[in-house]
A protein has these predicted regions:
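Hydrophobic faces of well-ordered beta-strands that scaffold small-molecule active sites
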Residues: 22-24, 85-87, 126-128
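Extended, structured polyanion-binding interfaces
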Residues: 1, 9, 24, 100-102, ...
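Acidic/aromatic-lined carbohydrate-recognition and catalytic surfaces
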Residues: 2-34, 119
Length: 170
């Protein structure tokens, strides 16, 4: 996707095109349904990964696991010149580990690690997204910016009700 690498692309955007800040999207589980077991991310920090009951690989919740995962991934992004991250799909984690971790266990350590790592790597420049479940927004120790609703689709009137409910309860 980036013929000369991500760092080169970001440097080009900033120096030649005047882009002040570059952000990267990522999912709280690594990707929507977790990490690819044969992918680079899973291979780079295997002790930081746990397998859910349905076989998804996601950052673990025990002790240093989530910090190890986020530090490895976000460290690479920071070294490439990324300035902030938007971490999506946060409320999916508690559903993915249902029956094996409590909602609090599913989120507290992972959010604490994410906030700590993004604070160190990006000066706290973190946008939390799709994390409108209470176990998510009450377990973020320091990141203040949260998108509190799922996607709003103005051309789909049925999406308005869900959008209003999610924002009213947050």
């Amino acid at each position: 996707r980036f013929p000369h690498g991500l760092a080169h692309t970001i440097a080009l955007l900033k120096t030649h095109y005047g882009v002040r800040s570059v952000g990267v999207w990522q999912a709280f589980q690594g990707y929507w349904n977790g990490l690819d077991e044969s992918g680079v991310a899973a291979a780079s920090c295997p002790t930081a990964i746990t397998t859910t009951a349905n076989g998804c690989l996601i950052p673990g919740s025990r002790a240093e696991q989530p910090a190890q995962f986020w530090d490895a991934w976000d460290g690479e992004l920071a070294e490439a010149g990324v300035d902030f991250v938007k971490v999506d799909s946060q409320s999916s984690t508690s559903v993915m580990v249902r029956g094996t971790e409590s909602y609090g266990e599913a989120t507290w350590g992972r959010h604490q690690a994410l906030d700590e790592v993004t604070s160190r790597r990006f000066g706290g420049a973190l946008i939390n997204c799709m994390g409108m479940a209470p176990e998510d927004y009450w377990h973020r120790p320091s990141s203040p910016i949260t998108r509190s609703s799922d996607d709003y689709l103005p051309h789909n009137p049925d999406s308005l009700g869900e959008h209003l409910i999610q924002n009213a309860y947050c």
